[in-house]
C-alpha cells in the first residue's frame, strides 16, 4: 500500500510540473512581436493577442523574444485559443 501511495504521489507531482511547463510556454504568446536590433531579414510569425491569430513579421536575427515562430503552424499549435480579455 505504501508503494501505491508513493507512485501515486510521483504521478501527481509530475502532472503538475507538466501542466505548469505548458502554461509557461503559452504565456510567450502574450508577448508583443520583437524584431530586435540586428539587420537580418527573417520571415517569422508571432501570435497577435488582439486578433487571436498568427501573423507574419520580419525578425532581425537577435534579441527577439519567445513569441517568434519559423512556421505559422507552429505558432498556431502553441498559441491556439488565446484571446485578450474583453476581445471581440
UniProtKB/Swiss-Prot annotation:
The record marks 77 as: Pore-blocking residue. Negative results: has no effect on chymotrypsin, nor elastase, nor the KCa1.1/KCNMA1 potassium channel. Shows weak inhibitory activity against mKv1.1/KCNA1 (1 uM inhibits less than 50% of currents), hKv1.2/KCNA2 (1 uM inhibits less than 50% of currents), and hKCa2.3/KCNN3. Changing residue 78 to A: 49-fold reduction in KCNA3 inhibition. Glycans are attached at residue 68. GO terms for biological process: envenomation resulting in negative regulation of voltage-gated potassium channel activity in another organism. GO terms for cellular component: extracellular region; extracellular space; host extracellular space. PROSITE patterns: BPTI_KUNITZ_1 (PS00280), BPTI_KUNITZ_2 (PS50279). The lineage of its organism: Eukaryota, Metazoa, Ecdysozoa, Arthropoda, Chelicerata. It is found in: Secreted. Dual-function toxin that inhibits trypsin at a molar ratio of 1:1 (Ki=107 nM) and inhibits mKv1.3/KCNA3 potassium channels (IC(50)=6.2 nM, and inhibits 80% of currents at 1 uM). Gene3D superfamilies: Pancreatic trypsin inhibitor Kunitz domain (4.10.410.10). The record marks 39-40 as: Reactive bond for trypsin. Keywords: Disulfide bond, Glycoprotein, Ion channel impairing toxin, Potassium channel impairing toxin, Protease inhibitor, Secreted, Serine protease inhibitor, Signal, Toxin, Voltage-gated potassium channel impairing toxin. Belongs to the venom Kunitz-type family. Scorpion delta-Ktx subfamily. Delta-Ktx 1 sub-subfamily. Residues 1-21 form the signal peptide. Its main location: secreted. Expressed by the venom gland. This is Kunitz-type serine protease inhibitor Hg1. Pfam families: Kunitz_BPTI.
